[in-house]
Amino acid sequence: MKFFLLILLLAPLKSESYYVAIYGNNNTNDGKSISYPFRTVAHAATVMSAGDTCFIRGGTYHEIVNITDNDGMDGMPLVFTRYNNERVIFDGTVSIDSNWVQHAGNIWKTTIDFDIWQLFVDREEQVMARWPNASFSDSSVFDTENHWAHGTMKQSTPNIYGNGTLIHQVKTNDQGELIDLSAQNFDLDETNKEAIGILNVGSFRTWSRKINSHTGNTFTYDPVPQNEWKTKEHQYFLEGRLEFLDKEGEWFLDTAPTKNVLYYWAPSGQDPNKLNIRGKVQSYAFVVSKSDHVELRNLEFFGTAFYFYKSNRSKVDQCNFYYPSSSKRMLRASGQEPDVSKIKSSSYTSVTNSAFRFTDGSAIETSGGNNVIKNNYFYHIDYTSSDLTGLMVSVLMSGKNNKFQNNTMHRLGASATVVGGDSALFEYNNIYDTGHVQSDGAMIQCMTGAQPGTVIRYNWLHNSKKYGARFDGNGAGNNGLMHHNVMWNLGNSGIMAKGYEHKIFNNTVINGPGNKNDILIMIGQGGNAGSITRNNVANRISGHRSGSYQNYPVPGTYDHNENGYESGRDVSTLFIDVANLDFRPNPDSVLVDAGTVITGITDSYSGSAPDIGAYEYGGDMWSAGIDWNVETKFGSAWIDYVNPAPQIDSIVVANNNTSLQAYFNESVFNSIENQSNLEASDFALSISGGTATLASATPTAITQNGNTYTLSFNLSGTPDG
């Protein structure tokens, strides 16, 4: 019997490189060379397939790139990236070029025939007209004590009013200003022009609602979800009316079916006609749907963001996001989640080595599972924290087995900073200056169902009025692990553990509030039966929020801890140099060799036994946060793209010196937003040397051959024969 072996030879898939440039053309160019690029990234996306790369030449692009049902493959993704390290910007704003006229006093106005929901002057966000006043420049938008208003509701007097009503508390702020709603004589409930309240009436949740009725210091609104409304401190501010525009840097948009009227108070009495004013008109520059293996690399985004939906194994890497998201409250959209950077129903995705700065809304939300957010910088995130998904946090990851690693985060509004989903890993993060505009909250927050398998390790959590890391909920959570974290200068406990069978190992918590315990292993709410607390150091470790260890011993197994309640020592003196972030124990410290071996946790210890706390004397001095410098990489402030002047390839002068032709072959364009053919009047030329001079700096003609342009000029001077 003979056997025949049939061998099929499959040709490897060929990858293509496509090029996009401001000076390109979607109709006549094939996009396959730098000389014949496409004009838009969106067009390139329509012809790309697995393994293809779109190289984008330097410039500012205002477009929406839709990618639907176009998968890459493992090792052959669809890649969108810059060309040759040139700076590529996706801009979600447009210039406000219409004429401004004075409206009243310092307030100017103009009409526009499009909607905007964020205003910028010289690329800096301006404040939506509000009461009480606040500013971005001094971060007073985060100061709820002095620049928000307050309700009379207190936890000690919980029945003053119900959900859907708020009674204002008259008070004086730190600048001596009386915050009295009734004294303002506002018309908050004018039909179709109602004020919008940003209402923190749910402790760690905030909603925006239109004001339904108003008398004196009392107003009503459509109730928020009843099970989320809390009888704790209430705080709020108001937007949505022209009468709130009473300070420089504020703006208001009076929306209308055909023409919108835009009002603005320019700083220092300036004429807005002379300012660089732009408005946000776009939520997303990239919308990727049902397309796996799509990658965005080395791109910058101003006033716009990305959205991935059902797009597994996609990546965002080395990108700079400046003002990526904003609420549409100025368009009278209340109770609506802002369009934030989002990866939805997608798994095995990653966001790495990128910066997210100045958001209204969460920095990023992911759902799906096995997603990674690593080595990113987050700053000035969400000054309202309203109308968000779930717990309304700065970064939300849902699904299972996510990783949040090596990130730096500071100046954050939401009470809870990061939620990681079920069985998440949080490690090597540097988080501080958080929780400014809501009550309650923790920097790393784990609710009941998320706790089994969750690991929180090697983090720096500090300088915040919130909890550091918390296993929270109704007490049913279990089997979470916290180890080798350092927490300092907190206004609440560094560690809180509700539930049971948790493991709390080798943590250092110092410089706590004094009236709260540093490590809290709750006796109530789960009771912590089976929990193990071992090798930790803090001044106050207890089973109660504020009561002593002697009165409230830590439940479960408790041993080999340095607890100031027991020793009477101030543990902050036991480390080498806390001020310079050296949390290793002093060589003669009682912490050295005072711990006990925990398999998988203390394996690399030196000496006769592990040290107590997060660091080993003589061991690895690990650090937390990003491993790059945001100012070096992306700058400390936004800088607009400046297109370099074209370099002239050659010059041909007529024999009689009467004319000159200049040739160039460079990326040249005359406008980003209002494109038209290049004209002679778009150019100016100067020459030096010799006796000839230009009759005019403006060319007499411009001709094109492919991407080579020829400019013609008349000369004056003495002919050389």
Predicted regions mapped to residue ranges:
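Low-complexity, Pro/Thr/Ser/Gly/Ala-rich linker/spacer regions in secreted
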Residues: 11-15, 620-649
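Extracellular polysaccharide-degrading/modifying enzymes targeting complex plant/algal/animal polysaccharides
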Residues: 19-310, 314-338, 596-609, 621-633
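Extracellular beta-strand solenoid repeats
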Residues: 55, 66, 79-81, 89-91, ...
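Predominantly extracellular beta-rich ligand-binding scaffolds that present long acidic/polar faces
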Residues: 63-79, 478-584
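Short glycine/acidic-rich loop motifs that flank beta-strands on beta-rich extracellular proteins
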Residues: 64-66, 304-308, 325-333, 337-339, ...
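Non-catalytic beta-sheet/beta-sandwich ligand-binding modules that flank or precede catalytic cores
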Residues: 641-721
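Sec-dependent N-terminal signal peptides
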Residues: 3-11
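Right-handed parallel beta-helix
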Residues: 292-302, 312-325, 347-361, 370-384, ...
